[in-house]
Protein backbone atom coordinates (compact mmCIF):
# COMPACT_ATOMS: atom_id res chain seq x y z
CA UNK A 1 0.00 0.00 0.00
CA UNK A 2 3.00 2.29 0.44
CA UNK A 3 4.55 1.40 -2.92
CA UNK A 4 3.69 2.08 -6.53
CA UNK A 5 1.92 -1.28 -6.71
CA UNK A 6 -1.86 -1.37 -6.86
CA UNK A 7 -3.45 -3.99 -4.61
CA UNK A 8 -6.62 -4.82 -6.52
CA UNK A 9 -7.79 -8.15 -5.10
CA UNK A 10 -7.56 -10.44 -2.07
CA UNK A 11 -8.68 -14.03 -1.64
CA UNK A 12 -9.53 -15.35 1.83
CA UNK A 13 -12.14 -18.09 2.24
CA UNK A 14 -12.15 -17.93 6.02
CA UNK A 15 -13.21 -14.38 6.95
CA UNK A 16 -15.86 -11.96 5.75
CA UNK A 17 -15.51 -8.30 4.80
CA UNK A 18 -16.49 -6.90 8.18
CA UNK A 19 -13.84 -8.98 9.89
CA UNK A 20 -11.25 -7.92 7.30
CA UNK A 21 -11.90 -4.31 8.24
CA UNK A 22 -11.47 -5.12 11.92
CA UNK A 23 -8.24 -7.08 11.40
CA UNK A 24 -6.72 -4.38 9.23
CA UNK A 25 -7.70 -1.56 11.58
CA UNK A 26 -6.38 -3.14 14.78
CA UNK A 27 -3.05 -4.94 15.06
CA UNK A 28 -1.38 -6.21 18.23
CA UNK A 29 2.10 -5.53 16.83
CA UNK A 30 1.78 -2.51 14.56
CA UNK A 31 -1.01 -0.75 16.41
CA UNK A 32 -4.05 0.94 14.92
CA UNK A 33 -4.07 1.68 11.18
CA UNK A 34 -3.79 5.44 10.69
CA UNK A 35 -5.57 5.50 7.33
CA UNK A 36 -9.14 4.74 6.34
CA UNK A 37 -10.56 1.23 5.98
CA UNK A 38 -14.19 0.35 5.28
CA UNK A 39 -16.53 -1.85 3.25
CA UNK A 40 -18.53 -0.42 0.38
CA UNK A 41 -20.24 -1.95 -2.65
CA UNK A 42 -19.08 -5.42 -1.59
CA UNK A 43 -15.42 -4.41 -1.65
CA UNK A 44 -12.72 -3.60 0.88
CA UNK A 45 -11.70 0.06 0.68
CA UNK A 46 -8.33 1.11 2.09
CA UNK A 47 -7.31 4.77 1.85
CA UNK A 48 -10.13 5.33 -0.66
CA UNK A 49 -8.88 2.57 -2.95
CA UNK A 50 -11.19 -0.39 -3.70
CA UNK A 51 -10.00 -3.99 -3.33
CA UNK A 52 -12.07 -6.85 -4.73
CA UNK A 53 -12.49 -9.70 -2.27
CA UNK A 54 -12.81 -13.37 -3.25
CA UNK A 55 -13.58 -16.25 -0.90
CA UNK A 56 -12.44 -19.37 -2.77
CA UNK A 57 -10.77 -22.38 -1.17
CA UNK A 58 -9.43 -23.71 -4.48
CA UNK A 59 -7.10 -21.25 -6.27
CA UNK A 60 -8.22 -22.55 -9.65
CA UNK A 61 -11.63 -20.94 -8.96
CA UNK A 62 -10.33 -17.44 -8.22
CA UNK A 63 -11.16 -15.07 -11.14
CA UNK A 64 -8.10 -12.86 -10.75
CA UNK A 65 -8.41 -11.54 -14.28
CA UNK A 66 -11.83 -10.02 -13.60
CA UNK A 67 -10.26 -7.76 -10.97
CA UNK A 68 -7.22 -6.89 -13.08
CA UNK A 69 -4.83 -8.80 -10.81
CA UNK A 70 -1.70 -9.83 -12.71
CA UNK A 71 0.84 -10.68 -10.01
CA UNK A 72 -0.33 -12.96 -7.22
CA UNK A 73 1.31 -13.45 -3.83
CA UNK A 74 0.60 -17.04 -2.77
CA UNK A 75 0.89 -16.75 1.00
CA UNK A 76 -1.31 -19.55 2.34
CA UNK A 77 1.64 -21.85 2.98
CA UNK A 78 -0.38 -24.62 1.31
CA UNK A 79 0.17 -24.22 -2.44
CA UNK A 80 3.97 -24.09 -2.41
CA UNK A 81 4.89 -26.26 -5.40
CA UNK A 82 4.95 -25.08 -8.99
CA UNK A 83 2.02 -27.31 -9.89
CA UNK A 84 -0.17 -26.22 -6.99
CA UNK A 85 0.64 -22.51 -7.29
CA UNK A 86 0.06 -22.62 -11.06
CA UNK A 87 -3.64 -23.05 -10.33
CA UNK A 88 -3.80 -19.25 -9.97
CA UNK A 89 -2.95 -18.93 -13.67
CA UNK A 90 -6.28 -20.50 -14.58
CA UNK A 91 -8.11 -17.42 -13.33
CA UNK A 92 -6.09 -14.93 -15.36
CA UNK A 93 -2.99 -14.32 -13.25
CA UNK A 94 0.29 -13.78 -15.12
CA UNK A 95 2.91 -14.42 -12.43
CA UNK A 96 2.88 -16.11 -9.03
CA UNK A 97 5.24 -15.35 -6.14
CA UNK A 98 5.22 -17.99 -3.40
CA UNK A 99 6.01 -16.34 -0.06
CA UNK A 100 7.68 -19.48 1.30
CA UNK A 101 10.34 -21.99 0.27
CA UNK A 102 9.31 -24.30 -2.55
CA UNK A 103 10.40 -27.82 -3.36
CA UNK A 104 10.64 -27.12 -7.08
CA UNK A 105 9.92 -23.49 -7.99
CA UNK A 106 12.90 -21.26 -8.83
CA UNK A 107 13.91 -19.42 -5.66
CA UNK A 108 14.98 -15.79 -5.54
CA UNK A 109 16.15 -13.48 -2.77
CA UNK A 110 16.28 -9.75 -3.43
CA UNK A 111 19.83 -8.47 -3.60
CA UNK A 112 21.27 -11.96 -3.94
CA UNK A 113 20.29 -13.70 -7.17
CA UNK A 114 17.66 -11.64 -9.00
CA UNK A 115 20.07 -11.48 -11.94
CA UNK A 116 19.24 -15.15 -12.55
CA UNK A 117 15.53 -14.41 -13.01
CA UNK A 118 14.15 -15.36 -16.42
CA UNK A 119 10.92 -13.63 -17.54
CA UNK A 120 9.67 -17.00 -18.78
CA UNK A 121 9.23 -18.09 -15.15
CA UNK A 122 5.56 -17.89 -14.21
CA UNK A 123 5.91 -19.27 -10.69
CA UNK A 124 8.78 -18.33 -8.38
CA UNK A 125 9.55 -18.62 -4.67
CA UNK A 126 10.74 -15.70 -2.55
CA UNK A 127 12.12 -18.18 0.03
CA UNK A 128 11.49 -17.72 3.76
CA UNK A 129 11.82 -14.67 5.99
CA UNK A 130 14.91 -16.20 7.60
CA UNK A 131 16.54 -16.90 4.23
CA UNK A 132 15.88 -13.29 3.19
CA UNK A 133 17.83 -12.16 6.24
CA UNK A 134 20.57 -14.78 6.03
CA UNK A 135 21.32 -14.87 2.30
CA UNK A 136 22.39 -11.20 1.93
CA UNK A 137 24.51 -11.62 5.07
CA UNK A 138 26.21 -14.70 3.64
CA UNK A 139 26.63 -13.07 0.23
CA UNK A 140 28.59 -10.12 1.59
CA UNK A 141 30.93 -12.37 3.59
CA UNK A 142 31.38 -14.89 0.79
CA UNK A 143 31.99 -12.29 -1.93
CA UNK A 144 34.58 -10.44 0.15
CA UNK A 145 36.27 -13.13 2.23
CA UNK A 146 34.98 -16.53 1.10
CA UNK A 147 33.03 -18.89 3.36
CA UNK A 148 34.55 -22.28 4.14
CA UNK A 149 31.61 -23.46 6.25
CA UNK A 150 29.10 -22.10 8.71
CA UNK A 151 26.32 -22.72 11.20
CA UNK A 152 23.26 -20.54 11.65
CA UNK A 153 20.88 -20.12 14.55
CA UNK A 154 17.74 -18.06 14.19
CA UNK A 155 16.05 -16.77 17.32
CA UNK A 156 12.59 -16.63 15.85
CA UNK A 157 9.49 -14.76 16.97
CA UNK A 158 6.23 -16.62 17.53
CA UNK A 159 4.37 -17.90 14.47
CA UNK A 160 0.67 -18.53 13.97
CA UNK A 161 1.01 -22.32 13.96
CA UNK A 162 2.37 -22.46 17.51
CA UNK A 163 0.24 -23.28 20.53
CA UNK A 164 -0.62 -20.87 23.33
CA UNK A 165 -0.92 -23.77 25.80
CA UNK A 166 0.52 -27.29 25.63
CA UNK A 167 -1.31 -29.46 23.12
CA UNK A 168 -0.87 -32.45 20.82
CA UNK A 169 1.74 -32.22 18.08
CA UNK A 170 2.50 -35.70 16.80
CA UNK A 171 5.18 -34.73 14.26
CA UNK A 172 6.99 -32.23 16.48
CA UNK A 173 6.62 -32.94 20.18
CA UNK A 174 8.45 -29.81 21.27
CA UNK A 175 6.36 -27.78 18.85
CA UNK A 176 3.29 -28.73 20.86
CA UNK A 177 4.51 -26.89 23.94
CA UNK A 178 3.23 -23.47 24.96
CA UNK A 179 4.84 -20.58 23.12
CA UNK A 180 4.01 -18.22 25.98
CA UNK A 181 6.70 -19.34 28.40
CA UNK A 182 9.18 -21.50 26.50
CA UNK A 183 12.23 -21.27 24.28
CA UNK A 184 11.48 -24.03 21.78
CA UNK A 185 14.21 -25.63 19.62
CA UNK A 186 13.00 -26.26 16.09
CA UNK A 187 14.30 -27.17 12.66
CA UNK A 188 14.72 -24.74 9.79
CA UNK A 189 15.73 -25.16 6.19
CA UNK A 190 16.76 -21.53 5.83
CA UNK A 191 20.52 -22.11 5.89
CA UNK A 192 20.37 -24.96 3.39
CA UNK A 193 18.12 -22.82 1.19
CA UNK A 194 20.95 -20.31 0.87
CA UNK A 195 22.68 -22.93 -1.26
CA UNK A 196 19.86 -22.62 -3.78
CA UNK A 197 20.30 -18.87 -4.22
CA UNK A 198 24.10 -18.87 -3.78
CA UNK A 199 25.17 -22.16 -5.42
CA UNK A 200 28.80 -21.91 -4.29
CA UNK A 201 27.56 -22.17 -0.68
CA UNK A 202 25.56 -25.33 -1.33
CA UNK A 203 26.45 -27.85 1.38
CA UNK A 204 28.46 -25.32 3.37
CA UNK A 205 25.72 -23.99 5.65
CA UNK A 206 23.11 -25.53 7.92
CA UNK A 207 21.22 -24.32 10.95
CA UNK A 208 18.49 -24.54 13.54
CA UNK A 209 15.85 -22.34 15.11
CA UNK A 210 14.75 -21.30 18.58
CA UNK A 211 11.14 -20.14 18.82
CA UNK A 212 10.79 -17.50 21.55
CA UNK A 213 7.79 -15.71 23.12
CA UNK A 214 8.06 -12.42 21.24
CA UNK A 215 5.52 -11.13 18.71
CA UNK A 216 7.74 -9.78 15.96
CA UNK A 217 11.34 -9.46 14.73
CA UNK A 218 13.74 -12.40 14.59
CA UNK A 219 17.52 -12.70 14.76
CA UNK A 220 20.01 -14.53 12.55
CA UNK A 221 23.19 -15.65 14.31
CA UNK A 222 25.71 -16.80 11.69
CA UNK A 223 29.01 -18.40 12.69
CA UNK A 224 31.40 -18.86 9.77
CA UNK A 225 34.94 -19.89 9.02
CA UNK A 226 36.29 -17.65 6.29
CA UNK A 227 38.98 -18.33 3.69
CA UNK A 228 40.65 -14.92 3.72
CA UNK A 229 41.87 -13.66 7.07
CA UNK A 230 40.22 -10.44 8.22
CA UNK A 231 39.78 -8.27 11.28
CA UNK A 232 36.28 -7.65 12.58
CA UNK A 233 36.66 -4.00 11.56
CA UNK A 234 37.33 -5.11 7.98
CA UNK A 235 34.24 -7.31 8.05
CA UNK A 236 32.15 -4.44 9.41
CA UNK A 237 33.43 -2.18 6.66
CA UNK A 238 32.34 -4.70 4.03
CA UNK A 239 28.79 -4.52 5.39
CA UNK A 240 28.87 -0.74 5.67
CA UNK A 241 29.87 -0.49 2.02
CA UNK A 242 27.24 -3.01 0.92
CA UNK A 243 24.50 -1.12 2.77
CA UNK A 244 25.37 2.04 0.86
CA UNK A 245 26.03 0.38 -2.48
CA UNK A 246 24.82 -2.73 -4.26
CA UNK A 247 22.65 -3.93 -1.36
CA UNK A 248 21.18 -0.58 -0.33
CA UNK A 249 17.65 -1.14 0.90
CA UNK A 250 18.32 -4.87 1.34
CA UNK A 251 21.01 -4.68 4.02
CA UNK A 252 21.11 -1.94 6.61
CA UNK A 253 24.03 -1.28 8.93
CA UNK A 254 23.54 -0.28 12.55
CA UNK A 255 26.10 0.64 15.19
CA UNK A 256 23.56 1.69 17.81
CA UNK A 257 22.53 -0.14 20.99
CA UNK A 258 19.26 -1.43 19.58
CA UNK A 259 16.94 -4.28 20.60
CA UNK A 260 14.43 -6.30 18.60
CA UNK A 261 11.38 -4.03 18.94
CA UNK A 262 13.38 -1.18 17.40
CA UNK A 263 13.03 -2.98 14.06
CA UNK A 264 9.27 -3.53 13.99
CA UNK A 265 8.05 -2.27 10.62
CA UNK A 266 11.57 -2.03 9.17
CA UNK A 267 11.69 -2.58 5.41
CA UNK A 268 15.25 -3.92 5.02
CA UNK A 269 15.69 -7.67 4.63
CA UNK A 270 18.73 -7.84 6.88
CA UNK A 271 20.01 -5.33 9.45
CA UNK A 272 23.66 -6.01 10.29
CA UNK A 273 24.29 -5.35 14.00
CA UNK A 274 27.93 -4.29 14.11
CA UNK A 275 28.03 -4.13 17.92
CA UNK A 276 26.68 -7.65 18.47
CA UNK A 277 29.16 -9.66 16.41
CA UNK A 278 32.29 -11.24 17.89
CA UNK A 279 35.47 -12.77 16.50
CA UNK A 280 37.62 -15.61 17.86
CA UNK A 281 40.43 -15.27 15.36
CA UNK A 282 41.11 -13.92 11.87
CA UNK A 283 39.19 -16.75 10.21
CA UNK A 284 36.38 -17.49 12.67
CA UNK A 285 33.58 -15.01 13.33
CA UNK A 286 30.01 -14.72 14.62
CA UNK A 287 27.76 -12.23 12.82
CA UNK A 288 24.37 -10.97 13.97
CA UNK A 289 21.55 -9.57 11.83
Swiss-Prot record:
Catalyses which reaction(s): D-glyceraldehyde 3-phosphate + phosphate + NAD(+) = (2R)-3-phospho-glyceroyl phosphate + NADH + H(+)
Keyword Cytoplasm on entry: yes
Sequence positions that bind NAD(+): 12, 57
GO annotation, biological process: glucose metabolic process; glycolytic process
Record flagged with keyword Oxidoreductase: yes
Coiled-coil features, chain-numbered ranges: none
SUPFAM superfamilies per the UniProt record, alphabetical: Glyceraldehyde-3-phosphate dehydrogenase-like, C-terminal domain (SSF55347), NAD(P)-binding Rossmann-fold domains (SSF51735)
EC numbers: 1.2.1.12
InterPro entries assigned to the protein according to its UniProt record, in alphabetical order: GlycerAld/Erythrose_P_DH, GlycerAld_3-P_DH_AS, GlycerAld_3-P_DH_cat, GlycerAld_3-P_DH_NAD(P)-bd, Glyceraldehyde-3-P_DH_1, NAD(P)-bd_dom_sf
Residues that coordinate or bind D-glyceraldehyde 3-phosphate: 128-130, 159, 188-189, 211
Oligomer status and interactors: Homotetramer.
Name of the featured protein: Glyceraldehyde-3-phosphate dehydrogenase
Species this chain originates from: Amanita muscaria (Fly agaric)
Amino acid sequence: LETDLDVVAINDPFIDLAYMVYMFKYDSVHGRFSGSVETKDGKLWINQKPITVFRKRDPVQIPWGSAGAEYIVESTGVFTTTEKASAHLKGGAKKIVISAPSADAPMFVCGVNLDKYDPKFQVVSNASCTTNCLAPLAKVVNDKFGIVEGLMTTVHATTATQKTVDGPSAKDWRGGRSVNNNIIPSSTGAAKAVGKVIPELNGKLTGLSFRVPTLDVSVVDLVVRIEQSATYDEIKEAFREASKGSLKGIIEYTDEHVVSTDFIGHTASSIFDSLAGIQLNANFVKLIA
